[in-house]
């Protein structure tokens, strides 16, 4: 199987998981994905193995696999890692007065104006990748590359918020400006604030989702239990006192 074909399927699935098009708990099968991507099952199988290795898939009863659940602690860890990489990158980049391509900011604002979540995530990844490249240390980008699938997923949760994306690109622009001006401490402070706020908002949104999901599940369970109890009543009790009389 051509490696680029496996990588294309893998990248498409990472993007779908990151944007929420494939949500936690969704079941996917090799056959379904092969039809969707118009490829044989072999590249799909290899891509699924990579996703399982990355912790994005888990076993499912019966056929196929499930998109792994999102856990607040896991996303905190992802943002701790990204925060450390960003802090080092902006320090090195600002020391060199590196210039971040302004079209990256424009692309992000454009995706925001179109409310296009996949493009917003792509633009965010592109901006942070540019920061890592501007640092002059190729190992920063390499380290981030090992975790992009989780970082994209974390971004998907954060950028899904109603108000979160409105200030993301203002913060990115301010970071790029401080880096270009050689203001190392200001660039670091802006980057740390950006990462911390994103992490806190992301975890809060995820916890709200979990509470809503648990509430809906509990309501459904209560309803099913009530219906089961009602079915177990004697016919006279189910009809009510007036009907039974």
Segments (PLM) and residue ranges:
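Acidic active-site catalytic centers that drive phospho-/nucleotidyl reactions
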Residues: 86, 124, 183
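Short helix-capping and inter-helix turn/linker motifs at the boundaries of alpha-helical repeat units
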Residues: 4, 118, 163-166
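Short linear motifs at protein or domain termini
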Residues: 1-95, 203-223, 228-245
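Conserved amphipathic alpha-helical segments that form helical-bundle/coiled-coil interaction surfaces
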Residues: 95, 99-157, 168-178, 186-196
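Mobile beta-alpha loop/short-helix "lid" or hinge segments that flank ligand
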Residues: 52-58, 147-149, 164-166
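C-terminal all-alpha effector/ligand-binding and dimerization domain
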Residues: 104-110, 157-245
């Amino acid at each position: 199987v051509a490696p680029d074909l496996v990588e294309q399927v893998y990248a498409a699935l990472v993007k779908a998981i990151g944007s929420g098009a494939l949500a936690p708990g969704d079941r996917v099968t090799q056959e379904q994905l092969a039809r969707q991507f118009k490829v044989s099952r072999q590249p799909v199988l290899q891509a699924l193995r990579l996703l399982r290795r990355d912790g994005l898939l888990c076993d499912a009863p019966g056929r196929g696999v499930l998109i792994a659940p999102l856990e607040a602690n896991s996303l905190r860890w992802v943002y701790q890692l990204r925060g450390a990489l960003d802090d080092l990158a902006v320090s090195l980049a600002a020391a060199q007065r590196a210039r971040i391509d302004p079209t990256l900011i424009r692309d992000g604002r454009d995706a925001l104006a179109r409310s296009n979540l996949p493009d917003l995530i792509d633009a965010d990844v592109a901006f942070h990748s540019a920061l890592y490249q501007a640092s002059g240390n190729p190992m920063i980008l390499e380290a981030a590359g090992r975790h992009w699938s989780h970082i994209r997923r974390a971004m998907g949760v954060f950028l899904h918020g109603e108000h979160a994306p409105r200030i993301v690109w203002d913060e990115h622009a301010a970071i790029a400006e401080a880096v270009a001006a050689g203001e190392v401490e200001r660039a670091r402070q802006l980057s740390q604030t950006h990462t911390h706020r994103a992490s806190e908002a992301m975890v809060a949104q995820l916890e709200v989702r979990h509470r809503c999901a648990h509430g809906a599940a509990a309501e459904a369970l209560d309803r099913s239990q009530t219906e089961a109890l009602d079915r177990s009543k004697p016919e006279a009790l189910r009809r009510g006192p007036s009907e039974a009389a």
